[in-house]
Amino acid sequence: MKVKICGVTHPDDAWEAAKAGADYVGMIFAKDSQRCVTKETAKCIVEAIRDGGSEPVGVFSEHSIGEIIAISSATGITSIQLSGRNIDFKFSQLRELFSIFYVVSVYSNGQPSAAIPPMSNTVTVIYDHIGGERGTPFDWRAFSPFQHDNWMLGGGVNPGNVGEAVRLLSPRGIDVSSGVERPGVLRKDVTLMQALIDSAKGVGNLTS
């Protein structure tokens, strides 16, 4: 069971996530996100987790291919998350350069908004509640993932419901952002991160 702590905005939070057992730490570069980070901050986050066992992931949406390559090169990021318009074209151009997380938006009723292109299991598909950063889950009981084994569940996961999510859907991983933040605070909470990671990995080990 893999866990990705996304929307990290501070190097200290990244270090705490790594120490808690996060497999991935995500940094958002989308300018319309309240968790958007600068290249300078992202570089500090990458440095903070260099020896902590977590892999840094750059989260991109409406960026051009050139921008994605430039930002990743400047910050030391080798894994990227793609979403938004022209995702399939960007995926086809970048799949040989980076480890890729491919986002599929899911409607509230549990129906994916689009199909996925052919891809190997080295690509991680993330199913996220449409719109992103909602903090609420889509209908897990009505949801059925595509025929692609390597996938993560995102959107509305938190320490209180992650066990149910893992038991119900058996994802390969969990992607969480606001679910490990206190209300009104855009910093990650150490206690919430540890609780979510322990629960996800504990239940995941029992169901695998």
Curated annotation (Swiss-Prot):
Q: What is this protein called?
A: N-(5'-phosphoribosyl)anthranilate isomerase
Among Pfam families, the record links this protein to: PRAI
Q: Which UniProt keywords apply?
A: Amino-acid biosynthesis, Aromatic amino acid biosynthesis, Isomerase, Tryptophan biosynthesis
Upper taxonomic lineage: Bacteria, Pseudomonadati, Chlamydiota, Chlamydiia, Chlamydiales
- Enzyme class of the recorded protein, top EC level: isomerase
Q: What SUPFAM superfamilies does UniProt report for this protein, alphabetically?
A: Ribulose-phoshate binding barrel
Pathway per the UniProt entry: Amino-acid biosynthesis; L-tryptophan biosynthesis; L-tryptophan from chorismate: step 3/5
Matching InterPro entries: Aldolase_TIM, PRAI_dom, RibuloseP-bd_barrel, TrpF_fam
Q: So what family is this one in?
A: Belongs to the TrpF family.
Query: Which source organism does the UniProt entry give?
Result: Chlamydia muridarum (strain MoPn / Nigg)
Q: Which gene encodes it?
A: trpF
Q: Which reaction(s) does its UniProt entry say it catalyses? A: N-(5-phospho-beta-D-ribosyl)anthranilate = 1-(2-carboxyphenylamino)-1-deoxy-D-ribulose 5-phosphate
A molecular function (GO) held by this record is: phosphoribosylanthranilate isomerase activity
| Claim: RNA-binding is one of the keywords in the record | no
Q: Recorded E.C. number(s)?
A: 5.3.1.24
Q: Which GO terms describe its biological process?
A: L-tryptophan biosynthetic process
Task: Report the transmembrane regions from the record.
Answer: none
